[in-house]
């Protein structure tokens, strides 16, 4: 820069570009040591914020992907099944005999419904709209009741009737012959893995 440009014009003297020179002088004043410190401080804050935004933009999608993968591995009930406790239940809309109902449930990797406590029994009663086959059966009225997995029923709840197959109705647990058409309830453990 030549000395002519930095020369302060005399009072009353005007020359072409005088406004530019005044602007230059004011600009030089703006870059004082005090202004430099403020400038560095602002630049530092901007850089910290930029790094934070970049870090968050990288971290958030990774977290979202991780959550999606975790959600895919949680235990869930299959579509059209209802979960309670650690079990899933399926309530049929059609009627059939006890043997067909059990075959249907087995095809779904389940059994005719088994309940292990009063809470599960009450849940089943609330969700059915007519009598439904459940997983209780026996060879004759002389034999004990068994679940479809062949474990013996503990007789916690009274079973009415002299039939060989158990069903659930508004009146509780009853029994009848296996050929009578009824709706049915399947049950399975809720460790079913959701397949996407």
Curated annotation (Swiss-Prot):
Disulfide bond residue pairs: 77-88, 105-186
Region (Disordered) location: 1-21
Glycosylation site list: 97
Pfam families listed in its UniProt record: Lectin_C
Keyword Disulfide bond: yes
InterPro entries according to UniProt: C-type_lectin-like, C-type_lectin-like/link_sf, C-type_lectin/matrix_domain, CTDL_fold, NKR-like_CTLD
Extracellular topological intervals: 63-196
PROSITE patterns from the UniProt entry: C_TYPE_LECTIN_2
Main location: membrane
Superkingdom of the organism of origin: Eukaryota
Membrane topology of the entry: Single-pass type II membrane protein
Keywords annotated in UniProt: Cell membrane, Disulfide bond, Glycoprotein, Lectin, Membrane, Signal-anchor, Transmembrane, Transmembrane helix
Signal peptide: none
Protein's job: Lectin-type cell surface receptor.
Protein name (Swiss-Prot/TrEMBL): C-type lectin domain family 2 member F
Organism: Mus musculus
């Amino acid at each position: 820069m030549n000395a002519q440009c930095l020369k302060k014009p005399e009072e009353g003297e005007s020359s072409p570009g005088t406004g530019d020179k005044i602007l230059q002088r004011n600009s030089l004043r703006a870059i004082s040591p005090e202004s430099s410190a403020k400038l560095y401080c602002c630049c530092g804050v901007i850089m910290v914020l930029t790094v934070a935004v970049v870090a968050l933009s990288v971290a958030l999608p990774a977290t979202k992907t991780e959550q999606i993968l975790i959600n895919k591995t949680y235990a869930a009930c299959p579509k059209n099944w209802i979960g309670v406790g650690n079990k899933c239940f399926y309530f049929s809309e059609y009627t059939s005999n006890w043997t067909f109902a059990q075959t249907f449930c087995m095809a779904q990797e389940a059994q005719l419904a088994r309940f292990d406590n009063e809470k599960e029994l009450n849940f089943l009663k609330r969700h059915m709209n007519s009598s439904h086959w459940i997983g209780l059966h026996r060879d004759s009225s002389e034999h004990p009741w068994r679940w479809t997995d062949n474990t013996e029923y503990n007789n916690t709840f009274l079973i009415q009737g002299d039939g060989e197959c158990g069903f659930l109705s508004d009146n509780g647990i009853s029994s009848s012959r296996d050929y009578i058409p009824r709706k049915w309830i399947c049950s399975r453990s809720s460790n079913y893995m959701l397949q996407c």
